[in-house]
Amino acid sequence: MDYKQYITIVEDWPQEGIRFKDITTLMQNGTAYKRAVEELAVYAKEKQADVIVGPEARGFVVGCPIATELEIGFVPVRKKGKLPREVIEANYGLEYGKDCLTIHKDSIQPGQRVVITDDLLATGGTIEATAKMVEQLGGKVVGIAFLIELAYIGGRDKLKQYDLFSLMSYE
């Protein structure tokens, strides 16, 4: 399926010079969204994932349905101050700023096979921070899956030690 036809490009958002790839139009089409989730779930199953991990917020709308499809757990990664129990944290840079992510200390068990999911790979900062926390907790990142890769930004280089999969790439 040509998923790009379901992505809306928004110029100069959230700041000037950014060509934002809006996945909400993909999600609004039930067939396209379902097929995208199914393709990403096949990848996660091939990686023998025990759990799916996704950063907020769009990582939730990608990762939760994959976890449901595979009948495995989903672990949310949230911005600082959003998780109620004891957490570890990692700072990261993104396409248009900097922030801090957290994950519950008890959310990943040593040796668990983890597939990280998100809507988009740009600089790789968000996913690098997420992977670092998963590994700090003893998990093994066996794959990382995206709806979209912005290849021209080069985030893949930052994540070269991991197996990456994306449904769409923008050069």
From Swiss-Prot:
Its EC number is 2.4.2.7. It is found in: Cytoplasm. GO terms for cellular component: cytoplasm. It catalyses: AMP + diphosphate = 5-phospho-alpha-D-ribose 1-diphosphate + adenine. Pathway: Purine metabolism; AMP biosynthesis via salvage pathway; AMP from adenine: step 1/1. One of its GO terms (molecular function) is AMP binding. Keywords: Cytoplasm, Glycosyltransferase, Purine salvage, Transferase. The keyword Cytoplasm applies. Pfam families: Pribosyltran (PF00156). InterPro entries: Ade_phspho_trans, PRibTrfase_dom, PRTase-like, UPRTase/APRTase. It is an enzyme of class 2 (transferase). GO terms for biological process: adenine salvage; AMP salvage; purine ribonucleoside salvage. Catalyzes a salvage reaction resulting in the formation of AMP, that is energically less costly than de novo synthesis. Belongs to the purine/pyrimidine phosphoribosyltransferase family. NCBIfam families: apt, PRK02304.1-2, PRK02304.1-3, PRK02304.1-5. Homodimer. This is Adenine phosphoribosyltransferase. It comes from Shouchella clausii (strain KSM-K16).
